[in-house]
Amino acid sequence: MSGFYHKHFLKLLDFTPAELNSLLQLAAKLKADKKSGKEEAKLTGKNIALIFEKDSTRTRCSFEVAAYDQGARVTYLGPSGSQIGHKESIKDTARVLGRMYDGIQYRGYGQEIVETLAEYASVPVWNGLTNEFHPTQLLADLLTMQEHLPGKAFNEMTLVYAGDARNNMGNSMLEAAALTGLDLRLVAPQACWPEAALVTECRALAQQNGGNITLTEDVAKGVEGADFIYTDVWVSMGEAKEKWAERIALLREYQVNSKMMQLTGNPEVKFLHCLPAFHDDQTTLGKKMAEEFGLHGGMEVTDEVFESAASIVFDQAENRMHTIKAVMVATLSK
């Protein structure tokens, strides 16, 4: 794909609005072709390395299925399956894998790791998630939003993110809003706002593209008129137990529930979540939360909202594969 060949995909602000839009158009075409049985393999003979320092369901499956659909082969390197950063430096790992593979996906820790891989690998490197950014998720989110509001431009859409906005999702949403002109509202306690420098940079770009970025602690004001309400988990199994109580106390009033959905005043408002979601007590962590903190109806989102007709989370999950496929095709085929 012209302009993308041999490029890295590390964060959204590395691209222009036009480039982002062309990736979304390619993803929509690849999705339609797959469903109609007309998909053409553009990556036959390509070899792809998937480095996972953090386990994943959606990201791994999306990369593997997308690669297989396009005729490529993959090697999965899990948390215990490589020497990266332990016995071998990131720089050396990049130079080794770059000699053997046509593309490398990295999902793990600091953004500096994926940036170093990109600097030394000599092949396209894709960010499957770092502590700072999650760009492939936002591609899927944007495609899903387009599908559910056909005919509307992004700068005519309002996206609310409720909860902990200081993480990789909050940062990537800021970058997405900057490029698309979304009306993005981060509804969160001030302690959970992203870094001010990134907010300032992205707000200026968003305004140039017809959008706006708002940070507020006021739930009612923040969600008014929203087309989409998005949230993510508040805690993870890797965090100290002491953090759980602190985080839940801080974010409890930002839970996505039927009241919040109604406060939008939009009967067609949709619910988004990057998954996994703790919406019931059917998981190990969900059960712990229910028992220790009384969160029997869900944590960051209630089961009622998650299972409602407003929920489009599984459309999002499917679109991870189509958008990741677009990234690989665009960067590996001429």
Swiss-Prot record:
HAMAP family to which the protein is assigned, alphabetical: OTCase
Catalysed conversion reaction: carbamoyl phosphate + L-ornithine = L-citrulline + phosphate + H(+)
Annotated Gene Ontology cellular components are:
cytoplasm
Give GO terms for biological process: arginine biosynthetic process via ornithine; citrulline biosynthetic process; L-arginine biosynthetic process
The listed outcome for residue 56 to H is: Much less active than the wild-type
- Compartment(s) where it occurs, according to its Swiss-Prot or TrEMBL record: Cytoplasm
User: Quaternary structure?
Assistant: In E.coli strain K12, trimer of identical or non-identical chains are composed of ArgI (I) and/or ArgF (F). The trimer has the following composition: FFI, FFF, FII, III. E.coli strains B and W, which are known to contain only ArgI, produce only a trimer of identical chains (III).
Kindly list the positions annotated as binding Zn(2+).
274
Gene that encodes the chain: argI
Family per record: Belongs to the aspartate/ornithine carbamoyltransferase superfamily. OTCase family.
- This protein is called Ornithine carbamoyltransferase subunit I
Provide a Gene Ontology MF annotation, just one.
Answer: metal ion binding
InterPro entries to which the protein is assigned, alphabetical: Asp/Orn_carbamoyltranf_P-bd, Asp/Orn_carbamoylTrfase, Asp/Orn_carbamoylTrfase_sf, Asp_carbamoyltransf_Asp/Orn-bd, Orn/put_carbamltrans, OTCase_ArgI
For this protein, the activity regulation entry reads: Reversely inhibited by N-(N-Sulfodiaminophosphinyl)-L-ornithine. Zinc is an allosteric regulator of the substrate-bound enzyme and a competitive inhibitor of the free enzyme.
Alphabetically sorted, this entry's keywords are: Allosteric enzyme, Amino-acid biosynthesis, Arginine biosynthesis, Cytoplasm, Metal-binding, Transferase, Zinc
Tell me the function of this protein. Reversibly catalyzes the transfer of the carbamoyl group from carbamoyl phosphate (CP) to the N(epsilon) atom of ornithine (ORN) to produce L-citrulline, which is a substrate for argininosuccinate synthetase, the enzyme involved in the final step in arginine biosynthesis.
Quote the pathway field. Answer: Amino-acid biosynthesis; L-arginine biosynthesis; L-arginine from L-ornithine and carbamoyl phosphate: step 1/3
Give the main location. cytoplasm
The keyword Zinc is assigned to this record: yes
**UniProt EC number:** 2.1.3.3
- Give binding positions for L-ornithine: 168, 232, 236-237
Q: Which organism is it from?
A: Escherichia coli (strain K12)
Q: Which PROSITE patterns match?
A: CARBAMOYLTRANSFERASE
Q: Which Gene3D superfamilies match?
A: Aspartate/ornithine carbamoyltransferase
Annotated carbamoyl phosphate binding lies at: 56-59, 83, 107, 134-137, 274-275, 320
Which NCBIfam families did the record assign? orni_carb_tr, PRK12562.1
